[in-house]
Design a protein with these regions (language model features):
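Bacterial N-terminal signal peptides
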Residues: 1-10
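A residue-level marker of the well-folded mature domains of exported/periplasmic proteins
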Residues: 13-263
Length: 263
C-alpha cells in the first residue's frame, strides 16, 4: 500500500517541482515488530524525492501518543500514520486530526469511529481463530488453556481473543480457565503467568498474544518446573535473535503465527 501512496506522491512532485510532502508516524510502542515496520516505511520513503518521514513512539502511553499526534498536527504534516495504543482513548484525537483535513491512515490498530481515511492491517480475528483451532488440534480436543493478552483496550487484543473463543467454543472439552492482560510485554507476562501457575494445577496450553508475551510465560513456567506440562503458542513470527521463529526452533514455543508488519 505504501508503494501506491508514494507513487502518487512522486507524480505530484514531478508536476509541482518539489514541495516537500511530510509524513508523521505516531507509533504506539517501541519493540522489534514496530522497528521492522518503521524500517519498511523509511526504506520505501527513500525512493521518492521530496518526502520526509518523522516517527514518534508513545511507549504504550495514551497521553504521550495524543501529544505526538498534536505535535504532528501543529507541524502541518501532509499525512498521518497512526497505530492507536488503545481504541477508546485515541478515538477523539484521531477524529480531530481527520476533521482538520489531514489524511489519516490507521495501521495495525483501529479506533471506535469511522473518521479516518484508511485502515491497513491483518485480520486479528482470523489469527485468533487459527490459534484456537491449532491449540484444540494439538490437545486432541481436550485440555485447559490460559490466555495472556495484549493491551486489553487495543483492537488487536480484543479481536484475537474473540477469534480464539469462536474457535474453541466448538470443542466442549477445551476450557479457557484463565485470562490476563500482559500489555504486549514479557515482564508483565511472566508475573501474570506465575500467578496463574499458583492458581491452576493443570494447564495444558498457553495462548500468548505475541512473541514477547510467550517467552515471559515460558520463563515463569520453567521457574516453577512446569514448562514441559504445557505448550506455548505466540503470534508475530519474526526472524532474528530472541524472536518468534528462533523461539520455535529452540523449542520454547510450539508454534508462532505470522502477523505482517505492513510497513
Amino acid at each position: 500500500w505504501m508503494l501506491v501512496l508514494f507513487g502518487l506522491i512522486g507524480m505530484t512532485a514531478c508536476r509541482q517541482d518539489t514541495p516537500r510532502f511530510r509524513i508523521g508516524v505516531a507509533q504506539c510502542s517501541d519493540d522489534s515488530w514496530r522497528h521492522k515496520m518503521n524500517d519498511e516505511i523509511l526504506r520505501e520513503a527513500m525512493f521518492y524525492n521530496g518526502v520526509s518521514v518523522e516517527i514518534r513512539s508513545a511507549g504504550d502511553d495514551n497521553s504521550k501518543q495524543a501529544e505526538d499526534v498534536h505535535y504532528f498536527m501543529d507541524e502541518g504534516v501532509d499525512l498521518l500514520i497512526i497505530s492507536a495504543n488503545e481504541a477508546a482513548p485515541m478515538t477523539p484525537i484521531v477524529e480531530e486530526a481527520y476533521q482538520k483535513g489531514i489524511p489519516v491512515i490507521l495501521v495495525d490498530r483501529k479506533i471506535l469511529s469511522d473518521k479516518y481515511t484508511a485502515y491497513i492491517g491483518a485480520d486479528n480475528y482470523e489469527i485468533g481463530r487459527s490459534v484456537g483451532n491449532y491449540i484444540a488440534s494439538s490437545l486432541k480436543g481436550k485440555g485447559n488453556i490460559v490466555e495472556l493478552t495484549g493491551l486489553s483496550g487495543s483492537t488487536p487484543a480484543m479481536e484475537r481473543h474473540q477469534g480464539f473463543m469462536a474457535a474453541i467454543s466448538k470443542f466442549p472439552d477445551i476450557k479457557l480457565i484463565d485470562k490476563a492482560d500482559a500489555a504486549w510485554e514479557r515482564g508483565p507476562a511472566e508475573i501474570e503467568m506465575d500467578s496463574m501457575l499458583r492458581r491452576h494445577p493443570k494447564i495444558d496450553a498457553v495462548y500468548a498474544h505475541n512473541d514477547r508475551i510467550a517467552p515471559g510465560a515460558y520463563q515463569a513456567a520453567k521457574m516453577a518446573g512446569r514448562e514441559k506440562e504445557m505448550i506455548f503458542v505466540g503470534i508475530d513470527a519474526l526472524p532474528g535473535k530472541g524472536n518468534g521463529l528462533e523461539l520455535v526452533l529452540d523449542s520454547v514455543l510450539d508454534a508462532t503465527f505470522i502477523y505482517p508488519t505492513n510497513g
